[in-house]
Amino acid sequence: MNVAGGGTGTTAGSAGNNNTLPMAQLADGWLELESDPGLFTLLLEDFGCHDVQVEEVYDLQKPIESPYGFIFLFRWIEERRARRKIVETTAEIFVKDEEAISSIFFAQQVVPNSCATHALLSVLLNCNENNLQLGETLSRLKAHTKGMSPENKGLAIGNTPELACAHNSHAMPQARRRLERTGAGVASCRFTGEAFHFVSFVPINGQLFELDGLKPYPMNHGCWEEHEDWTDKFRRVMAERLGIATGEQDIRFNLMAVVPDRRIAITHKLKMLRTNQAIVSGTLQKLLKADEQGERDEQQRPDTPNTLLEPSAFTARDLQSLLKNLDTEIAINEQHLADENDRRQMFKVDASRRTHNYDKFICTFLTMLAHQGVLGELVSQHLLPSKKISGQSAANRLNKQNSAAASTANSSAGATAGGAKSQQQQQQQQQPQQPQTPKNGKSPGKTPGRRRKGRNKCRKRK
């Protein structure tokens, strides 16, 4: 979730809901806020404007019912090429007439990190008071800054303690620590290299205005056509703006709409449906009684040409069907109202989680783990997974190398042993065989057959 606002000023005191903080601690001590519609809705309630809510817009082509204005959050990079294109385009539509500027609420952002509040005020304080109840704080600010220059209006916003306290009460603890770490002397988002910034788009006197507290003048995008709504003109401007901004594939932006509180419209519709339900139910009861009475009178009264009954506009069956439809509509709207109330409650739960400081809990928890002797093991298991994986990989590679070396050694040893054995067999085959000594110890003589053959030869000679 993007955080709006750039640099910081001097350290701010505890914001909360305490409106008695010293002015010296509020003027330059505004904190960064997230671009969350729930946060903005609760911030409007803290300003005293209870009939408004903020919704995030995901589809530009989807119609939005009765918006007061739009808030556009985009990435602010002064040196970016796309940024220069936007500046060159918008320089032609600056409104420099002092009388025209003083007739609208346009305030320059002179307090760092206050662009979220500036964007909301640019929408609310340019709306018709007959359609919107601003509350005491905003009504007083609007009356007090009437006719002021844009710079003085920005100073008036920064010097309003109710606004500063409400703004800072929705900041995360990290924003306060960042403010304390940087301190004064750091440039605001007007001069930072990269930050996220809010601007407002509102209809004023039949023309679409873009109000940016970091610009010297408001921007007039002109009138919309007679047959279209001002939101159609806004869609065309945003489509062109996003086409320029995303030229370098930078799509980090979001869009929010400031709309009437949906619960008010749902409650009004429920009241109307219940009134119609009571009317239809009463009419149905009267019709049923009239039918019963008519049947009894018909039985008692003689038929004459002068006794004519007016035909009813609705039959009992028609009224029963209408009553059933009303019951269904009431159930649907009651569910919508319950969903909106649950959503508003979740905004408060998320705000409590966002602004709560978990530092003490985390420190105490880690201290208890250290006393129990399990902190080191948890760190080695969860915080150093890459080292463990790399160590296991090295061990696996070493085991594979050892296995390969062992298999190579075994194969070479087997080959050496086989060669020696074959050489020994060859030597044994080349050596003459020694006669075997018999068991009785006597050397073997000639075979009896040879001796007999020799004797026969001698006898023949004689």
UniProtKB/Swiss-Prot annotation:
Compositionally skewed regions (Basic residues) per UniProt: 448-462
Transmembrane annotation, as ranges: none
Domain of life (superkingdom): Eukaryota
Region (Positively charged C-terminal tail required for binding nucleosomes): 387-462
Record-annotated ULD domain positions: 357-385
Keyword Nucleotidyltransferase carried by entry: no
Keyword annotations from UniProtKB, A to Z: Chromatin regulator, Hydrolase, Nucleus, Protease, Thiol protease, Ubl conjugation pathway
Ranges annotated as biased composition (Low complexity): 399-447
Reactions catalysed: Thiol-dependent hydrolysis of ester, thioester, amide, peptide and isopeptide bonds formed by the C-terminal Gly of ubiquitin (a 76-residue protein attached to proteins as an intracellular targeting signal)
E.C. code: 3.4.19.12
Site positions for Transition state stabilizer: 109
Annotated GO CC locations: chromatin; cytoplasm; PR-DUB complex
Active site (record annotation): 115, 197
Subunit details: Catalytic component of the polycomb repressive deubiquitinase (PR-DUB) complex, at least composed of caly/calypso, Asx and sba (MBD5/6 homolog). The PR-DUB complex associates with nucleosomes to mediate deubiquitination of histone H2AK118ub1 substrates; the association requires the positively charged C-terminal tail of caly, probably due to direct binding of DNA. Interacts (via ULD domain) with Asx (via DEUBAD domain); the interaction produces a stable heterodimer with a composite binding site for ubiquitin.
Similarity comment text for this entry: Belongs to the peptidase C12 family. BAP1 subfamily.
Name of the protein in its database record: Ubiquitin carboxyl-terminal hydrolase calypso
Organism from which the protein derives: Drosophila virilis (Fruit fly)
Lineage: Eukaryota, Metazoa, Ecdysozoa, Arthropoda, Hexapoda
